[in-house]
């Protein structure tokens, strides 16, 4: 039996450190989950170097011995650790797509060309609005920072405005319906 699986919708949250990406991401994940949607996330490790391994675990020892990947499963949870020179964003998305989520949400990877929300906390963050591609919505912390900026348009919300989260959900559902 062949089943047809649509590709997941990919959406980004971009902004500098401490701009509220993780907080907005967790709210969006919870909102989509409450609608019965499956979400996978991809996070850029923006602190330089490799993310930490799970220390003192057999799987980490396997990697340290030279395995290119180690997958641990228990009661339906999988932890995958893999080593190689680098992973393109497309390869990371392909890995997550195997889990058949409705949505793949990316935190970071600012320069990628997926539809994105940009978070502006400080005046210096405004340069993101002219330097990034495919911005569909902006979240700001202080109206004074963005009030004279002509790049914002109508899809701009205060970081605490629940209408912004609703706007993203509706945008994602439109993309999902277009993807069918």
Each language-model region and where it sits:
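Walker A (P-loop) phosphate-binding motif
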Residues: 1-47
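P-loop NTP-binding site
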Residues: 32, 95-98, 177-180
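Phosphate/Mg2+-binding loops and adjacent switch elements
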Residues: 103-158, 162-178
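Glycine-rich phosphate-binding loop used to anchor ATP phosphates in small-molecule kinases
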Residues: 79-120
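Short, hinge-like loop/turn segments at secondary-structure boundaries
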Residues: 56-61, 88-89, 122-124
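Solvent-exposed alpha-helices and their adjacent loops that cap or buttress functional pockets
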Residues: 3-6, 63, 96-98, 128-131
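Short coil/turn connectors at secondary-structure junctions
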Residues: 6-8, 35-37, 67, 100-101, ...
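N-terminal phosphate/diphosphate-binding loop that engages ATP/GTP or pyrophosphate donors
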Residues: 29-84
């Amino acid at each position: 039996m062949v089943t047809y699986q649509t590709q997941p919708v990919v959406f980004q949250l971009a902004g500098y450190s401490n701009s509220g990406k993780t907080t907005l991401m967790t709210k969006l994940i919870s909102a989509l989950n409450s609608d019965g949607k499956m979400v996978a996330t991809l996070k850029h490790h923006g602190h330089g170097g490799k993310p930490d391994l799970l220390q003192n675990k057999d799987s980490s020892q396997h990697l340290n011995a030279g395995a290119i990947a180690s997958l641990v499963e228990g009661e339906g949870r999988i932890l995958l650790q893999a080593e190689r020179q680098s992973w393109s964003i497309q390869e990371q998305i392909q890995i997550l797509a195997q889990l058949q989520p409705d949505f793949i949400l990316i935190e970071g990877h600012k320069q990628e060309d997926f539809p994105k929300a940009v978070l502006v906390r400080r005046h210096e963050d405004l340069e993101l609005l002219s330097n990034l591609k495919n911005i569909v919505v902006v979240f700001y912390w202080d109206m004074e920072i963005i009030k004279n900026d002509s790049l914002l348009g109508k899809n701009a919300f205060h970081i605490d405005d629940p209408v912004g989260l609703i706007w993203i959900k509706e945008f994602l559902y439109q993309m999902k319906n277009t993807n069918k």
